[in-house]
Amino acid sequence: MDKYVQIGLITKPHGLRGEVCVVSYADSPFLMQERIFLQAGKGPCVPYRVRSSRRHSGTELLLLEGIDDRNAAEKLRQHKVLIPHAELPELEDDEVYIEDILGFTVVLDEDGSTLGTLTAFSAPTPEQEVWEITTPDGKEVLFPAAEEFVAEIDVDSETIRITPPPGLLEIYLSGS
């Protein structure tokens, strides 16, 4: 069974002929050139052939086979855009795919204490990734995964060392 990787999210229809707007999480738009899979929530991954793709006002626009009008495109709102993990390009030595580090233990760089586990991620914009970290007592911390706040990702030990912005953890963890 293929393992899929989310590379984007359909946000809304565009125009009348069935195009959809996609917030892309991928560095390369070429990942959405021929075939993609769409998933609603935790439902099945459904394959679609990409008839055309183009960039418009900072977002990717896709025209998918079988999606021929705005009504059909509207039904795809908030669907995840995925590709098989095997189709991802090779990474540099210091790079990782977010899906490969889900489940890693997150520790504070300052004192080495465990904050929790990386359980999910989102990318409100292509330049801004947010990690969801679940603490041992079940609290959810939304963490800006900017380079200046991520000290190290150690794939061998499955740990991520972070340096949170001042006051961030207090917002989520106070009132315990």
Swiss-Prot record:
Location in the cell reads: Cytoplasm
Domain of life assignment: Bacteria
One Gene Ontology cellular component annotation held by this UniProt entry? ribosome
One of the record's GO molecular function terms: ribosome binding
Keywords on record = Chaperone, Cytoplasm, Ribosome biogenesis, rRNA processing
Record-annotated PRC barrel domain positions: 93-168
The record's section on InterPro entries has: PRC_barrel-like_sf, PRC_RimM, RimM, RimM_N, RimM_N_sf, Transl_B-barrel_sf
Describe its function. Answer: An accessory protein needed during the final step in the assembly of 30S ribosomal subunit, possibly for assembly of the head region. Essential for efficient processing of 16S rRNA. May be needed both before and after RbfA during the maturation of 16S rRNA. It has affinity for free ribosomal 30S subunits but not for 70S ribosomes.
Q: Which family does it belong to?
A: Belongs to the RimM family.
NCBIfam families annotated for this entry? 16S_RimM
Subunit-structure text: Binds ribosomal protein uS19.
The protein, known as: Ribosome maturation factor RimM
Name the species this protein comes from.
Oleidesulfovibrio alaskensis (strain ATCC BAA-1058 / DSM 17464 / G20) (Desulfovibrio alaskensis)
